[in-house]
Amino acid sequence: MSYAELIEEQKEETRDIIAALLEDGSEPEALYTIEHHFSADTFAELEAAAVEAFKMGFEVLEAEELELAPEDGGGKVVCFDAVMESALNAELIDEQTEKLIALADKHDIDYDGWGTYFESDEDDEEDESEDKPEA
């Protein structure tokens, strides 16, 4: 897949992810932890990309080794996530994605998309009620 095709595919996936979250009732105004996923065959291949992602302002989570399922070709890969807090805004996430796809391309590693977690304002309401003094 070409660089341009990957960018377009990611833009489409971004909109699908956002739509699914909002349809499920996720809080539209919340800040989300956006985790961008990278993988390679060796830790050495990931190292320079992880350092550069950190310099770009992302929190870089510790790399780990994963065993692939047989239907995914088997074997092992190493991976890390570059994380940033962000509004659930397609254009902002597109900017992050484009920068990180370019980073992966530069270091000849794989950009494996992004993910986040459902955010609910119900948790905030529960937290607030826990903080209120009892009468």
Curated annotation (Swiss-Prot):
Subcellular locations according to the entry: Cytoplasm
GO CC list: cytoplasm
Could you tell me the keywords of this UniProt record? Answer: Cytoplasm
The keyword Signal belongs to this UniProt entry's keyword annotation: no
Compositionally biased tracts (Acidic residues): 119-135
Which SUPFAM superfamilies does this UniProt record tie to the protein?
Hypothetical protein VC0424
GO MF terms listed in the record are: endoribonuclease inhibitor activity; enzyme binding
Q: Where is this region: Disordered?
A: 114-135
Organism's domain of life?
Bacteria
Give a short account of what the protein does: Globally modulates RNA abundance by binding to RNase E (Rne) and regulating its endonucleolytic activity. Can modulate Rne action in a substrate-dependent manner by altering the composition of the degradosome.
Subunit composition? Interacts with the C-terminal region of Rne.
Q: Which family is annotated?
A: Belongs to the RraB family.
The protein's name in its UniProt record:
Regulator of ribonuclease activity B
Q: Which organism is it from?
A: Photobacterium profundum (strain SS9)
Underlying gene: rraB
